[in-house]
Amino acid sequence: MTSRRRAASTALAGLAATAVALTACGTGEQAAPGADDKIKVVASTSVWGSVVQAVGGDAVEVESIVSDPSADPHSYESTPQDAAKVTDAHLVVFNGGGYDEFIEQILGSGNQKPTVEAVKDEHEGEQNGHEGHGDQPAAPEEHGHEGHGDQPAAPEEHGHEGHGDQPAAPEEHGHEGHDHSVNEHVWYDLHVVHEVADQVATELGKLQPAKAEQFRQAAGQFEAEVGALEGKVGEIAAANQGKPVIVTEPVAHYLVEAAGLQDVTPQSFVKAIEAETDPSAAAVAEIQNAINAKQAVAVIYNPQTESPVTRNVRTAAEQNQIQVVEMTETLPEGKTYVQWMDTQIAALQNALNQNR
């Protein structure tokens, strides 16, 4: 299997912004569903599958290719069965940015159909401006895989309040030498999730126009729930602005940023973890010293990428009475996206409350 970071580093070279991108083409499309048929949607992961289900309800049949909570979409290798599911789908929803490259590979092989993509590479269209994500052009440009047709005008822009200013076109960074402004884990960016729900509702409405209003209302309800999560994150930011945290992997980067927290993880450590190499003795010593000096109020820990090094970080934090907050990469079984995020946001809030 390929390295979980190799695909991401290739696809993210030159990634300028997170945005929702929409693709629709005629070649190879599945016939539109009948008025009483379920719309077949393939999602790359159960995270995006949960968003689709919230918007589509009983009108959709959602197939998430990566649904095992312990699976790693970075290195997932698609099967002929996966390709057949994509071919048979009316709509495909995926993350992009190299995170779920297997979907992009299938789509690139001729299965061209309407898609909603959560990450937009600068090579695929105009850069999108999010307030605080950097000074970039205003709206995502709809784009396609090679051979895809043009689409109507781009969706209206949304701002990211509370995100730090970043350059419009950052230097190329993969996960080897990861820059914190470039991160494909956009489901931790609640605003992007809001945009994805909007686009899903739009595409479902095109497939079944008689239910377009139903999808719009469902998206509105989902977005209200996401908005409530944003409110909770805003409360965290108001009470904890600038407080330092250490992360074992920046999977929750956008949430940490929105919460007003300062990631003080030594860059040498981050670069090694992201490149899936063992951190140098100096990097390990640097993060150990930071923890021993209690230079962070919490450690954000991804148990799904646990290694002896990260376990030692966790142990050191616990020995120094520094709160450890688990934030995972994939959706736990039996939980919706909103339930999952709510649980993690509450855990972060509780940990920070311990340091007041």
Regions found by a protein language model. Name each.
Residues 2-356:
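Extracytoplasmic metal-acquisition and chelation regions
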